[in-house]
A protein has these predicted regions:
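A polyanion-binding, active-site-adjacent surface
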Residues: 32-220
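Short intrinsically disordered, low-complexity coil segments enriched in acidic
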Residues: 1-3, 193-194
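Short intrinsically disordered terminal tails
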Residues: 26-28, 224-227
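N-terminal leader/targeting segments
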Residues: 2-5, 20-22
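Acidic, Ala/Val/Gly-enriched low-complexity intrinsically disordered segments
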Residues: 5, 9-11, 25
Length: 227
């Protein structure tokens, strides 16, 4: 293969990478701010073990993002593949939103900013929770890179506790049930993990009432961005 053709194919491949928004923002200033932020995160003593192992923080902050997804923390599969929501939970979430996998990863309309940008490890009953104070340190600076966010999807208790603060309800179920109180900016969700099928069976109102409204709100934002 000629060198020119080879390089063209490489560039095409890189352009399709879902994390290109972390590495090549449109606009030099934002690129510099993002690079500076990543360097600061990697230099933080709290993250020293990850940096030593060559593990980079896992988040996505496209400048033109309209929808922000705040979850718990990357799982081991996400950390190893460098691809967020790359599992059955991600498939379920995309189905709930009514978007394809390609659109989700390549449109730059979705930002993913978990409560911890690193896989926290395995506990006795699943993954460990996100580390304390991580979001307090880094979320404000990360969100400042994305001035056009219109919808923040809060997946799970940790994200809801942090962003809803005193407006959250007594538990996740009640918070999700009260989703209308947080619209149009916030939308609390149960985690789309297959492990939550029992919760959904016990709370049929979620699929019947909440998910249609959730998809409607997501599609409103997407359609507005296309105008």
């Amino acid at each position: 293969m000629r060198l020119g053709v080879f390089l063209h194919e490489v560039v095409k491949h890189l352009h399709k990478l879902p994390y290109r928004s972390m590495l090549s923002e449109k606009g030099g200033m934002n690129m510099t701010k993002l690079e500076e932020l990543i360097k600061k995160i990697e230099a933080d003593p709290q993250n020293a073990e990850y940096t030593k192992e060559g593990i980079a923080p896992l988040f996505s902050a496209p400048r033109k993002a309209k929808i922000l997804i705040v979850g718990q923390a990357p799982g081991i599969k996400a950390q190893e593949s460098r691809l967020f929501w790359n599992d059955q939970s991600g498939d379920n979430l995309r189905s709930w939103m009514g978007v394809t996998r390609d659109f989700f990863y390549q449109s730059d309309l979705f930002a993913v900013v978990p409560m911890d940008y690193y896989y926290p490890g395995k506990g006795k009953s699943g993954d460990l929770p996100p580390r304390k104070v991580f979001a307090e340190k880094w979320h404000e600076e990360t969100l400042a890179l994305m001035p056009d966010i219109e919808l923040i999807i809060l997946v799970g208790k940790y994200a809801q506790d942090y962003y809803l603060k005193e407006t959250k309800k007594k538990n996740l179920t009640e918070t999700v049930k009260a989703y209308k109180e947080y619209l149009p900016k916030m939308f609390p969700l149960v985690h789309p993990s297959p492990l939550n099928r029992r919760w959904m069976a016990k709370n049929p109102w979620f699929e019947k009432e909440v998910l249609p409204e959730f998809q409607k709100r997501v599609q409103e934002v997407i359609k507005g961005a296309k105008k």
